Swiss-Prot record:
Heteromer composed of three CRYAA and one CRYAB subunits. Aggregates with homologous proteins, including the small heat shock protein HSPB1, to form large heteromeric complexes. Inter-subunit bridging via zinc ions enhances stability, which is crucial as there is no protein turn over in the lens. Interacts with HSPBAP1. Interacts with TTN/titin. Interacts with TMEM109; in the cellular response to DNA damage. Interacts with DES; binds rapidly during early stages of DES filament assembly and a reduced binding seen in the later stages. The gene is Cryab. Residues 142-175 are annotated as: Disordered. This is Alpha-crystallin B chain. GO terms for biological process: apoptotic process involved in morphogenesis; camera-type eye development; cellular response to gamma radiation; lens development in camera-type eye; microtubule polymerization or depolymerization; muscle organ development; negative regulation of amyloid fibril formation; negative regulation of apoptotic process. It comes from Rattus norvegicus (Rat). Pfam families: Crystallin, HSP20. Lens as well as other tissues.
Amino acid sequence: MDIAIHHPWIRRPFFPFHSPSRLFDQFFGEHLLESDLFSTATSLSPFYLRPPSFLRAPSWIDTGLSEMRMEKDRFSVNLDVKHFSPEELKVKVLGDVIEVHGKHEERQDEHGFISREFHRKYRIPADVDPLTITSSLSSDGVLTVNGPRKQASGPERTIPITREEKPAVTAAPKK
């Protein structure tokens, strides 16, 4: 039986991409999926790439999702903070930035001991007064930070368009 031996000094066509470390395929900061713990026939292929996170199973919802919305009458930020109690969260306004900070010390869960900390910053839109920003925490662990948008001053009016007979662009004189 013949055994193929690959010498390290021989470069193959896709050399950096055959590496078992899969550096380009790592999703840094994301939790592991169950499928990541088991090798499959496709993951053993040197050309296999893990699908992008937006195409994977909806377990990404469980990762501290943040959403910022600009509606007609208000600005809002929704942030999943279900692993934190209200005492472990701080919301501050510094100039035109909202800072959300959450931290809990090491504690035991079903897998062992864990501690968590995060910092998020959101720019406050120009038409939102920083003094009117409020925050609330829902029973399912979603922190909502919002503020009303300033209404345009004065009533809306339509401006008529007049037609002029002379051109706006005139040709430059020839030399």
